[in-house]
């Protein structure tokens, strides 16, 4: 239908040329134009359905491919949202773990500081007690040594009661 309208339009445009006097050179172009139009019309008549079906198939193929790409794009966007959500959850979990680790480290530090303080105090008490015992032991040995020397020298005489009193006062 469109082809027929085009052919008629072309003929109407060429009609002024037909009314004029023609010489041989002008008729050749008209014949060639008419032959071309007939050739195009015949091609259109035989190939129009095949061309339409081919173009329709290509259109469907492109549409199908576009739908697949859009589905992939949608899946990619959903996957991106899911991964971003997982990333946020991982960040929150990491912050929670770091916070818990800091609290636990502080608790452990406090515990060991307290235990160390108690251990140091116990060591100081034990060392003072040991020093006191050693001082008493040394005093006792010194007093015994002095009394032993004094008894053996026999320059000074002590009664037993005097020795006991001296030992009680010094120890």
Curated annotation (Swiss-Prot):
Transmembrane stretches in the record are 2-22
How does this chain sit within the bilayer? Single-pass membrane protein
Statement: the UniProt record of this protein carries the keyword Transmembrane: yes
Compartment(s) of residence: Cell inner membrane
Q: Name one Pfam family in it.
A: ATP-synt_B
Q: Which domain of life is it from?
A: Bacteria
Has keyword Membrane?
A: yes
GO molecular function ontology, one term from the record? proton-transporting ATP synthase activity, rotational mechanism
Q: Name one GO cellular component term.
A: proton-transporting ATP synthase complex
Keyword annotations for this protein, in alphabetical order, are: ATP synthesis, Cell inner membrane, Cell membrane, CF(0), Hydrogen ion transport, Ion transport, Membrane, Transmembrane, Transmembrane helix, Transport
Subunit description: F-type ATPases have 2 components, F(1) - the catalytic core - and F(0) - the membrane proton channel. F(1) has five subunits: alpha(3), beta(3), gamma(1), delta(1), epsilon(1). F(0) has three main subunits: a(1), b(2) and c(10-14). The alpha and beta chains form an alternating ring which encloses part of the gamma chain. F(1) is attached to F(0) by a central stalk formed by the gamma and epsilon chains, while a peripheral stalk is formed by the delta and b chains.
Q: Which NCBIfam families match?
A: PRK08475.1 (NF006292)
What does the protein in this record do? F(1)F(0) ATP synthase produces ATP from ADP in the presence of a proton or sodium gradient. F-type ATPases consist of two structural domains, F(1) containing the extramembraneous catalytic core and F(0) containing the membrane proton channel, linked together by a central stalk and a peripheral stalk. During catalysis, ATP synthesis in the catalytic domain of F(1) is coupled via a rotary mechanism of the central stalk subunits to proton translocation. Component of the F(0) channel, it forms part of the peripheral stalk, linking F(1) to F(0).
The record's family statement is: Belongs to the ATPase B chain family.
Protein name, as recorded: ATP synthase subunit b
Q: Which organism is it from?
A: Helicobacter acinonychis (strain Sheeba)
- Originating gene: atpF
